[in-house]
């Protein structure tokens, strides 16, 4: 067995290298729900934000007390690590159906809704056959929102998110490795929902992309499009808020003229409580502004269908 002895300078350099990825905290959904309730106060979409906050509370309850599940295939996990592939590849796991008990548990735990449309959506999911549920899930995770009813999206997306976050938190250290694609989640292969500009210690100023499905965050250099990887002529757009200058805005969208896409970025320096999903839902006015300017949203939010609110 060969051994490498690090010299003092190498040890210091290694200690200053920021981690490639971060797992979500085990109270992710509880904190997200609290953030949504905070943002809902006086917001024109307050009712929807409160509905999603309720879903987040249910997600947290399921994460704390998960349904009975078969363990993930250890041989597949080994091969994924060996070949630099996402161990929780969503396209494969969705088709295998290991996430379906999470959907059943979420539907069983959701309180009787007063809203008739919500009740109808829940009933449609309950009555759907396994094949239909899988088809809807594939459509949602591949961004084909026109292939599933918009009213189903928040509930289907919530079940998928908590299932994948549970699996991610259960992986052994080192199971997730850097993959060839830096623009997709190294854990599950999903696109990012937003970028988080970190604040604190050696990570200050670094950007981590937040996965739309499993909530893994992975390091991605700044001033580089998270869709086409172009670095030229990127611009940053924010909405005026309480008279704050643009350079102190919590939210700024990074726009790319090469692919006409954009990604929202949240600067934790100015609000350490910002949450990728909650703050994204609360800032759809910025999406509308960007759409008017001809930019396309490349980052999905699994709890909202485009045009569905």
Curated annotation (Swiss-Prot):
Sorted UniProt keywords: Cytoplasm
Species whose genome carries this gene: Pseudomonas aeruginosa (strain ATCC 15692 / DSM 22644 / CIP 104116 / JCM 14847 / LMG 12228 / 1C / PRS 101 / PAO1)
Main location per the UniProt record: cytoplasm
Statement: the UniProt record of this protein carries the keyword Cytoplasm: yes
Protein family according to the UniProt entry: Belongs to the FdhE family.
This protein's record includes keyword Protein biosynthesis: no
Name this polypeptide is given: Protein FdhE homolog
GO biological process: protein maturation
Location of the protein in the cell: Cytoplasm
Cellular component aspect of the GO annotation: cytosol
Domain of life: Bacteria
Function: Necessary for formate dehydrogenase activity.
Signal peptide: none
HAMAP family: FdeH
Pfam families hit by this protein: FdhE_C, FdhE_central, FdhE_N
Gene3D superfamilies per UniProt: FdhE-like domain
């Amino acid at each position: 067995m060969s051994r490498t002895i690090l010299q003092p300078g190498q040890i210091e350099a290694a200690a200053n290298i920021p981690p490639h990825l971060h797992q979500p905290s085990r109270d992710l959904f509880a904190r997200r729900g609290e953030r949504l309730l905070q943002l809902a106060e006086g917001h024109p979409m307050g009712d929807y934000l409160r509905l999603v906050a309720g879903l987040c509370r249910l997600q947290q309850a399921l994460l704390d007390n998960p349904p009975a599940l078969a363990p993930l295939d250890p041989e597949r996990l080994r091969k994924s690590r060996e070949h630099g592939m996402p161990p929780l590849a969503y396209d494969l796991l969705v088709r295998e159906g290991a996430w379906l008990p999470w959907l059943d548990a979420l539907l069983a735990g959701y309180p009787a809704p007063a809203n008739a449309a919500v009740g109808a959506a829940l009933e449609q999911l309950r009555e759907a056959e396994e094949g239909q549920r899988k088809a809807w899930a594939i459509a949602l995770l591949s961004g084909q929102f026109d292939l599933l009813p918009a009213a189903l999206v928040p509930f289907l997306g919530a079940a998928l998110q908590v299932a994948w976050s549970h699996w991610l938190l259960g992986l052994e250290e080192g199971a997730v490795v850097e993959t060839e694609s830096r623009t997709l989640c190294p854990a599950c292969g999903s696109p990012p929902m937003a970028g988080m500009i970190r604040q604190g210690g050696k990570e200050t100023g670094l950007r981590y992309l937040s996965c739309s499905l499993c909530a893994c965050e992975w390091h991605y250099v700044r001033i580089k499009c998270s869709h086409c990887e172009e670095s030229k002529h990127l611009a940053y757009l924010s909405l005026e808020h309480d008279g704050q200058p643009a350079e102190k805005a919590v939210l700024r969208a990074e726009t790319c003229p090469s692919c006409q896409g954009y990604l929202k970025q949240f600067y934790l320096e100015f609000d350490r409580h910002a949450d990728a999903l909650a703050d994204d839902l609360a800032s759809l006015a910025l999406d509308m502004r960007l759409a008017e300017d001809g930019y396309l949203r490349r980052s999905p939010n699994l709890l909202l269908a485009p045009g569905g609110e």
